[in-house]
Amino acid sequence: MAKILCVLYPDPVNGYPKTYARDEIPNITVYDNGQTAPTPKAIDFKPGELLGSVSGELGLRKYLEGLGHEFIVTSDKEGPDSEFEKHLPDAEIIISQPFWPAYLGPERLAKAKKLKLALTAGIGSDHVDLESAIKHGVTVAEVTGSNSISVSEHAVMMILSLVRNYIPAHEWAEKGGWNIADCVERSYDVEGMHVGTVAAGRIGLAILKRMKPFDVHLHYYARHRLSKEEEEELGLTFHENVEDMVKVCDVVTINAPLHPETHHMFDEAMIKKMKRGAYIVNTARAEICDRDAIVRAVESGHLAGYAGDVWNPQPAPADHPWRTMPWNGMTPHMSGTSLSGQARYTAGTREILECWFEGRPIREDYVIVDGGKLAGTGALSYTVLEHHHHHH
């Protein structure tokens, strides 16, 4: 019998929903890159339910208790007296989501003597210190691809919102105003602009595809160049380095994983290379940007706006400057946990657990660290530096 420790975000302030705004969600079985959606043997939830909060339990309790395991669910994850720390020493499996991550740094991984599997319900496993996971022989897995489109839709929404000045204009409408000039003095069309992505994996590529019909000029920087066919189909300009790309872009969207190479990539020096009046949308990871350099750039007017849904730490403190800096279009970390996205990554979490308990290999796409090294998607998307230490 194993102890499974699951860290989820708190329920809504008015309690766990009894009804939902919609009765069903579209059933997506194959992603646009041909990867099939998760294929667990069974699920104990209805797609479209809230699964990522504490009472939702990722729909796993019936399954795990049916196998005789102990299943602990909590949102209390910070500090030495937290529920999370209390159960850490004897948990065999730890499950959390990027939106409310159970940070597993070197100290916590050293304490987690029985830990065998760190499972991310969602995409992005940088809340786990991968070097330490490698050292301790912990398998790290995530549900690659499950919510890529969820995130890319959010990013496209944010690009349009910033450029067209949607949020301030909406606020005028709510306040009873009809201040057309106030609304439009920062409102532009995206048509004809130069839009570039940092990384062109599933999310970056999906954003490029969705932006193409807006008749913009598309640019990208990536570690692995796309095929000639893809470049021609989307009319993409490839850049060998980020500096060259940002010089020509009106909008930069960040879609890279966080690892030593991308940490603080958008610092004072990089932002200075951008056009005055450019916009940044970051739905990847907060630490790819230098927090205070972003604040200074929007305050000085060098950036016309910054939007994203990722923060450091998560949850972000109430006084985090990105909440109140001018021309921000921030949301809490929600893009990948739409009810549509969470239906898929929850099914994927179930698939990974079924494989684990039945001794079958986990889908290659879902593996980040295995057998003491980067593997699967991890080997493609992440780097680890031998002497690099993360601080959370």
Predicted regions and their residues:
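Phosphate-binding beta-alpha-beta segment of Rossmann-like dinucleotide-binding domains, i.e.
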Residues: 136-138, 143-194, 206-209, 213, ...
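Short glycine-/small-residue-rich Rossmann-like dinucleotide-binding loops
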Residues: 98-99, 123, 250, 256-258, ...
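An N-terminal-biased, well-structured beta-alpha scaffold segment characteristic
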Residues: 2-139, 267, 388-392
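Alpha-helix C-terminal capping/helix-to-coil transition sites in glycosyltransferase folds
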Residues: 89-90, 114, 247-248, 273-276, ...
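Rossmann-like dinucleotide/phosphate-binding beta-alpha-beta segment
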Residues: 26, 166, 181-276, 296, ...
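Conserved beta-strand positions in the Rossmann-like core of class I SAM-dependent methyltransferases
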Residues: 72, 219, 287
